[in-house]
Regions:
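Contiguous surface segments at macromolecular interaction interfaces
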Residues: 1-5, 10-29, 47-50, 58-194
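GIY-YIG nuclease signature motif recognition
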Residues: 53
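Compact alpha/beta protein-protein interaction domains typified by the UBC
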Residues: 42-45
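Short coil-to-beta transition motif at edge beta-strands of beta-rich domains
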Residues: 31-40
C-alpha cells in the first residue's frame, strides 16, 4: 500500500516524548484520513527536518471517549484534548532519524516556493524536495509500535505530563549519553530535574 507522504511540523519542546517512544499518539485539529509517512520538521529555533515518522490511520477522539467511564483519567484527558480542539489521535508507529538533519534553508534552495506548514502539507506536490529527502542517510528505526490496541495509559496524555514520568527521566538520561544527542537539538517543556 502506498502511503500519503507529508511534511509535518512540530514544536521542538514537544519532540522528546516521541523520540523516547513514550508518546504513542500525535493529536491534531485536522489530519489526513489515512496512514501517512511524515517527514518531521522541528520549527524555530531548530528549523530542521530531522527524520521520518510512520503514522497509522487517525481516529476521532469524540468517538473514542464514549468507551470510557466519566470518572477515569483517560476520559478526563480525552475531554481536555477535545476542549483544545484536538479532534484526531494519530498513532505513531515508528521513528527514524536522519544522520544529518536538514536546514529548512536547504529545502527552500531546492524549491523556492516551498513553505513550512502550520500543520502538514502533501510532499508529493514538491517532488524535488521529496527526492532529496528520500536520499538522506538514516539511522536504524528508533522504535516500532503495533497499534492493535489503544494505549490507554498514554492516550491524550500531555507532553508536560510525560516529561514528569520516571520512564521519561530514565530514557532522557540514556539519550544524553548517546551519540545522536547532538543531532536532535530540542529542549524540554518542564525544567529538567537532575
Amino acid at each position: 500500500m502506498n502511503k500519503r507522504i507529508i511534511f509535518l511540523s512540530f514544536r521542538p519542546k514537544f519532540f522528546r516524548p516521541i523520540l523516547y517512544d513514550i508518546k504513542k499518539y500525535e493529536y491534531r485539529k485536522r489530519f489526513c484520513d489515512e496512514p501517512t509517512t511524515a517527514y518531521l520538521y522541528l520549527s524555530s529555533p531548530i528549523r530542521k527536518v530531522i527524520g521520518i515518522m510512520e503514522l497509522g490511520k487517525p481516529f476521532r477522539m469524540d468517538e473514542i471517549v464514549q468507551n470510557y467511564d466519566k470518572d477515569t483519567d483517560v476520559y478526563r484527558r480525552i475531554n481536555e484534548c477535545l476542549n483544545c480542539g484536538e479532534k484526531f489521535a494519530v498513532p505513531i508507529e515508528s521513528l527514524q532519524l536522519f544522520k544529518k538533519p536538514i536546514s529548512i534553508n536547504v529545502i527552500k534552495e531546492i524549491e523556492p516556493k516551498f513553505f513550512v506548514p502550520r500543520c502538514y502539507l502533501n510532499l508529493e506536490n514538491y517532488r524535488n524536495v521529496l527526492s532529496y529527502l528520500k536520499n538522506q542517510d538514516m539511522y536504524d528505526i528508533e522504535f516500532f509500535n503495533i497499534h492493535d490496541k489503544i494505549y490507554e495509559d498514554n492516550l491524550a496524555m500531555t507532553c508536560r505530563e510525560m516529561e514528569l514520568t520516571d520512564e521519561f527521566l530514565k530514557k532522557d538520561n540514556e539519550y544524553l549519553n548517546n551519540s545522536k544527542y547532538d543531532i536532535v537539538e530540542c529542549g524540554y517543556i518542564n525544567v529538567r530535574r537532575k
